[in-house]
Amino acid sequence: MAAAGAEAPGAWCVPCLVSLDTLQELCRKEKLTCKSIGITKRNLNNYEVEYLCDYKVVKDMEYYLVKWKGWPDSTNTWEPLQNLKCPLLLQQFFNDKHNYLSQVKKGKAITLKENHRALKPAVAEYIVKKAKQRIALQRWQDELNRRKTHKGMIFVENTVDLEGPPSDFYYINEYKPAPGISLVNEATFGCSCTDCFFEKCCPAEAGVLLAYNKNQQIKIPPGTPIYECNSRCQCGPDCPNRIVQKGTQYSLCIFRTSNGCGWGVKTLVKIKRMSFVMEYVGEVITSEEAERRGQLYDNKGITYLFDLDYESDEFTVDAARYGNVSHFVNHSCDPNLQVFNVFIDNLDTRLPRIALFSTRTINAGEELTFDYQMKGSGDVSSDSIDHSPAKKRARTVCKCGAVTCRGYLN
């Protein structure tokens, strides 16, 4: 049995010591395929267009500078239009060019002459950067979906700027305890119900009500803990008291916001009100360590610390480097997600799991948000559990834009 907190094979990543171009050249030299860097049997000895870099007209003939998939930039060649059988890449090339010119001209009309002349170096540079960004984001998206253990798919989108994947973020599906912290994920009791919805089940043993209705929607007020059936229970996976442990069921998109809030998360499907959406996971650290890290994060203007203060204030979840999709969920003073403490296999009340449920119906395309303070809801009284992220020393300006915006995140 693996030690508590041990990572699954392949969970650790290290930076490569050579460039992608060098790796591709080495693979071709040794006749090796490597899908993750674009070297496949299909293009090992053949040429496939990866993206278009530049454009020019010579003697009334259109030429495009082609980046060949799996080949270094040094092998790029100018090809006449009639040789290219990649209509989607051609369309993407012109879309990127148009977007760049639109940004430069700040919405002014682009003339026919401007749209057909040879590209200026700045335009070509932007198109190449955008193409490389698109490839990097696709690889990151693929990596996220390989690592996730839940049903819902993860998509990545950036139509705002040239920002690529975060360089120091590692996707995890559950808490990662820091050295010296042990998570005992083994329940001390379990139910023997034949129907957990009607019988006295795990919640009753803990002295609370069953959290869900027949439609798998949460029915208890914020501040009330959720006790789900666990690995010792005799009920099966279809038990109505196994919701959070099934993971995210919705397809979500990590997207670049246009209001200066960096990355955000939106749902790609409709989410019914009071439904479980995702867990907030990260590295579990002591409150003392959280205080130290918090001072560093304040200087960077980032907020990823979340106090586990259901019963005590001993531990904090830090999602800055290790986390899941919730790492990218932005704050709002008028959020559509609400935090609940959850206990499943680990019944240590100092270490609840943090689940986010929808407060209302959320339509496809809407950004998901939660209140980093969780004190503005009328559902939480002054003596209820404080679910707020770890306390900060510097005030961070809020950009949520809500009518009820408090002006600061803390």
Curated annotation (Swiss-Prot):
It catalyses: L-lysyl(9)-[histone H3] + 3 S-adenosyl-L-methionine = N(6),N(6),N(6)-trimethyl-L-lysyl(9)-[histone H3] + 3 S-adenosyl-L-homocysteine + 3 H(+). Its EC number is 2.1.1.355. S-adenosyl-L-methionine binds at C261, G262, W263, Y304, N330, H331. Residues 189-247 form the Pre-SET domain. The modification Phosphoserine is found at S381, S384, S388. Residues 47-105 form the Chromo domain. Its main location: nucleus. CDD domains: CD_SUV39H1_like, SET_SUV39H2. Zn(2+) 1 binds at C191, C193, C196, C201, C202. Keywords: Biological rhythms, Cell cycle, Centromere, Chromatin regulator, Chromosome, Differentiation, Metal-binding, Methyltransferase, Nucleus, Phosphoprotein, Repressor, S-adenosyl-L-methionine, Transcription, Transcription regulation, Transferase, Ubl conjugation, Zinc. Zn(2+) 3 binds at C196, C229, C235, C239. This is Histone-lysine N-methyltransferase SUV39H2. It comes from Bos taurus. GO terms for biological process: cell differentiation; circadian rhythm; methylation; negative regulation of DNA-templated transcription; negative regulation of gene expression, epigenetic. The keyword Cell cycle applies. It comes from the Eukaryota. Residues 250-373 form the SET domain. Interacts with SMAD5. The large PER complex involved in the histone methylation is composed of at least PER2, CBX3, TRIM28, SUV39H1 and/or SUV39H2; CBX3 mediates the formation of the complex.
